[in-house]
């Protein structure tokens, strides 16, 4: 008799995605981050749901409701810190996932890649709005500064900002709508994840060698289910260590001060995972130019498939491109550091140099190096 998982309409979908899915035998642990991201999303939705039961999205009570969750709700503190630090784990996994896609040429599956870019924007928007909800000083001023960037859009900018704010400043209406969107977006992200997987399973997974792996496949279960479970356990262990030993390590102390529109903090900065983009924004003295650079720093991922000039798909056998890739990683770490520093010498010039280098590596150095490697292959 045929197994029910292969005949039942619903189980068949699960079976084809998680059990009998053929996977290249050479995929390494860098391919684990998709499942880690799914685990992160599940943790965020679950903890967020329970936090939303106790949170109030009103400027008068938002800060106190978060304090109430931490002090009075059973295990509320662990829910709050799991959610806050879970976002950090989410972005660590997300950036490694994108980095793996760049290194191993996964962007050649353009539909999957483009949905991935949409997902990245959606997760960033969700995280930004979530940071506003505790209504501390950095929440309020972060929301004010970042939403104000839209005023750089010619003609409609000012009206657009006031429309988003629901008034003439970040206030009660802003907080309420941000909470509504912050609750809604993760479910949209979950739907996009399904589309992302749908496109991925049309082509099958890429592999470290970059050559077709049709003759050499293994079933997803048990090999990759065990591998993914191990990865998830390691990630949850790291998250637990962070939550239980130093929950405020990645947060800003200013966010423990209730929002005060009359008192501007000396250094307004977003969470660590946005600092690289914030540094690029600040490195351009012109407001509109800065906003364009900020958007392009992520949107540039969309044109990477067009800039692929190499005859080989992955960087596995391309040492010059590997050097450039790790230079890009170092540059992003430099930008992250600069984003957290005050706007003064020498940080300004370092930020500007790192910002120029970021775009130069992607737009110029990588395609040229790939073309040069093609030429060297003829020798």
Curated annotation (Swiss-Prot):
Localization per Swiss-Prot or TrEMBL: Mitochondrion inner membrane
Protein name per Swiss-Prot or TrEMBL: Cytochrome b
Binding-site residues, heme b b562: 83, 182
Cofactor note text: Binds 2 heme b groups non-covalently.
Statement: the UniProt record of this protein carries the keyword Endoplasmic reticulum: no
Necessary cofactors: heme b
Organism: Pteronotus personatus
Residues given in the record as a ubiquinone binding sites: 201
Biological role stated in the UniProt entry: Component of the ubiquinol-cytochrome c reductase complex (complex III or cytochrome b-c1 complex) that is part of the mitochondrial respiratory chain. The b-c1 complex mediates electron transfer from ubiquinol to cytochrome c. Contributes to the generation of a proton gradient across the mitochondrial membrane that is then used for ATP synthesis.
Domain of life of the source: Eukaryota
Recorded GO CC terms: mitochondrial inner membrane; respiratory chain complex III
Additional observations: Heme 1 (or BL or b562) is low-potential and absorbs at about 562 nm, and heme 2 (or BH or b566) is high-potential and absorbs at about 566 nm.
Family the UniProt entry places it in: Belongs to the cytochrome b family.
One Pfam family in the UniProt entry: Cytochrome_B
Molecular-function GO term, any one: ubiquinol-cytochrome-c reductase activity
Transmembrane segments: 33-53, 77-98, 113-133, 178-198, 226-246, 288-308, 320-340, 347-367
Quaternary structure annotation from Swiss-Prot or TrEMBL: The cytochrome bc1 complex contains 11 subunits: 3 respiratory subunits (MT-CYB, CYC1 and UQCRFS1), 2 core proteins (UQCRC1 and UQCRC2) and 6 low-molecular weight proteins (UQCRH/QCR6, UQCRB/QCR7, UQCRQ/QCR8, UQCR10/QCR9, UQCR11/QCR10 and a cleavage product of UQCRFS1). This cytochrome bc1 complex then forms a dimer.
């Amino acid at each position: 008799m045929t197994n029910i998982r292969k005949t039942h309409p619903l189980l068949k979908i699960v079976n084809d995605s998680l059990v009998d899915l053929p996977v290249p035998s050479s995929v390494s642990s860098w391919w684990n981050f998709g499942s880690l991201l799914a685990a992160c999303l599940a943790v965020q939705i679950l903890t967020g749901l329970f936090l939303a039961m106790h949170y109030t999205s009103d400027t008068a009570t938002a800060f106190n409701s978060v304090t109430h969750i931490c002090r009075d709700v059973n295990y509320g503190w662990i829910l709050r810190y799991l959610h806050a630090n879970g976002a950090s784990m989410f972005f660590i996994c997300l950036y490694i996932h994108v980095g793996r896609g760049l290194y191993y040429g996964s962007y050649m599956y353009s539909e999957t890649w483009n949905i991935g870019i949409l997902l990245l924007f959606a997760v960033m928007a969700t995280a930004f709005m979530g940071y506003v909800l505790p209504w501390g000083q950095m929440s309020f001023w972060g929301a004010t500064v970042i939403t104000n960037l839209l005023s750089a859009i010619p003609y409609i900018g000012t009206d657009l900002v006031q429309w988003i704010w629901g008034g003439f400043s970040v206030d009660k209406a802003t907080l309420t709508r941000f909470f509504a969107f912050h609750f809604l977006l993760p479910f949209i992200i979950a739907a996009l994840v399904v589309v992302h997987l749908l496109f991925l399973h049309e082509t099958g997974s890429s592999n470290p060698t970059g050559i077709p792996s049709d003759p050499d496949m293994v079933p997803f279960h048990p090999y990759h289910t065990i591998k993914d479970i191990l990865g998830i356990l390691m990630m949850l262990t790291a998250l637990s260590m962070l939550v239980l030993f130093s929950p405020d390590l990645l947060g800003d102390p200013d966010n423990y001060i209730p929002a005060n529109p009359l008192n501007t903090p000396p250094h307004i900065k977003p969470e660590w995972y946005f600092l690289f983009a914030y540094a690029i924004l600040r490195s351009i003295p012109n407001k509109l130019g800065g906003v364009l650079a900020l958007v392009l720093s992520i949107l540039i991922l969309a044109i990477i498939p067009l800039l692929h000039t190499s005859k080989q798909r992955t960087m596995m056998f391309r040492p010059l491109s590997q050097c450039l890739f790790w230079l890009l990683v170092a540059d992003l770490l430099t930008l992250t550091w600069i984003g957290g520093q005050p706007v003064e010498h020498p940080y300004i010039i370092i930020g500007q140099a790192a910002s120029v280098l970021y775009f130069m590596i992607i737009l110029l150095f990588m395609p040229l190096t790939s073309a040069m490697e093609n030429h060297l292959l003829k020798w």
